[in-house]
Amino acid sequence: MKIACTLVLFVMLRCYVNARNIPGTCRTHTGIILLSGEEWKDPNHCSTYRCSIFDGEAELEGVTCAAYHVPPHCRLVSAANELYPQCCPTVICSDKSR
């Protein structure tokens, strides 16, 4: 019997980025420009970003999966080709009592 544990912990990243010459916008690390209130899910890094205005400045907020400590008899399994949060890893542990 296997026990699947999904940890719902998130890491919040913040950076202040304005897209060049376009007030009220943010630019992602890949160069995508987001308007205030828009969200973008990064398909290569299992994270999501949202552009918002804070104190009159555009702010790009990012959220990604938590870091995991995998106990003995367990393994980390990721869902390939999924977007955040479905791409976050799950800890799968085997039942050693049998």
Curated annotation (Swiss-Prot):
Give any Pfam family that matches: SVWC
**Modifications after synthesis and translation:** Contains 4 disulfide bonds.
Which UniProt key words apply to this protein? Disulfide bond, Secreted, Signal, Toxin
Localization of this protein: Secreted
Tissue specificity here reads: Expressed by the venom gland.
**Leader peptide range in chain numbering:** 1-20
Top-level division of the source organism's lineage: Eukaryota
GO cellular component terms attached to this protein's record = extracellular region
Principal localization reads secreted
Protein name (Swiss-Prot/TrEMBL): Venom toxin OcyC11
Question: Can you tell me which family this protein belongs to?
Answer: Belongs to the scorpion La1-like peptide family.
- Recorded source organism is Opisthacanthus cayaporum (South American scorpion)
GO molecular function terms listed in the Swiss-Prot or TrEMBL record: toxin activity
